[in-house]
A protein has these predicted regions:
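Conserved catalytic or regulatory cores that recognize and/or transform ribose-phosphate-containing ligands
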Residues: 1-246
Length: 246
């Protein structure tokens, strides 16, 4: 019940609620906790059209030997009218899963709250994120001028910071580009942004910071097409796909 206490921040759980949680756990947990297979909790939006790609990641992982990939939505309900049931299910399953894979395509929706949970809890060490059209921001991943322009476009599309902050962050981005050996000025970046339209998802500044944290830890996999998303999924640790599928 430690995961339940973490989910509820020490809130007292009634006897009936405890019985229901334990009954649910006895039904759902064995497949997750099976030590002979690798368990992946897959997170993402349940809204169309995003859900289809989240399900595609789960299906791709389940092609591997000895793998159980699942969504919280695949699991039965616990019937906890008083308690935040999703939090309970999230913390129990995230605790028991070997890895957590999270797909992001927008700056709104429940999956964004999950990003915060992953970044601030012990689940961080087992988590891998897949943000759509995220542009690398650290100097290790800036290889040419186009990378800098794309990262700047992403910065300018950020939804929750003022122009002064954007200007300061653009200066910092150009400094990182310079450290990576890319000769480009702030004025040149601004001009190119005005001349060329770059369509990027409008992530918030908080989310971009979380993405950057995962990027620095080598567990961020940007993608633009579903094919790229599935190819990135193959890079997750765990059992490989069958040889005949390679």
């Amino acid at each position: 019940m430690e995961a339940v206490q973490q989910a509820l921040h020490g809130l007292d759980v009634g006897s009936t609620e405890a019985v229901r949680i334990l009954s649910w756990a006895n039904s759902e947990i064995p497949a997750i906790y099976d030590r002979d297979q690798t368990a992946y909790l897959v997170l993402g939006s349940y809204r169309d059209p995003y859900f289809r790609r989240v399900r595609a990641v789960s299906d791709r992982l389940n092609r591997r030997y000895g793998t159980y990939a699942f969504l919280i939505g695949d699991l039965s309900d616990i019937d906890l009218p008083r308690l935040p049931e999703f939090r309970v299910k999230f913390h129990i399953t995230a605790t028991l899963s070997d890895y957590v894979a999270a797909v992001f395509e927008q700056d709104a929706g429940g999956e964004i709250n999950e990003l915060g949970k992953l970044g601030e809890t012990e689940y961080f060490e087992k988590a891998y994120i897949f943000p759509r059209a995220y542009q690398w921001e650290t100097e290790d991943h800036l290889s040419d001028e186009h990378d800098v322009i794309a990262a700047a476009a992403q910065l300018m599309a950020t939804t929750d910071i003022d122009d002064e902050t954007k200007t300061a962050e653009l200066d910092a981005l150009v400094d990182r580009a310079d450290q990576a050996g890319i000769d480009i000025s702030v004025d040149e970046v601004t001009t190119k942004l005005e001349e060329h339209g770059f369509e990027v998802p409008s992530y918030s500044w908080v989310h971009l910071n979380d993405f950057r944290l995962f990027e620095l830890h080598g567990r961020c996999y940007p993608w633009t097409t579903e094919e790229e998303l599935l190819e990135a999924t193959d890079d997750l640790p765990g059992s490989p796909r069958p040889g005949w599928e390679q």
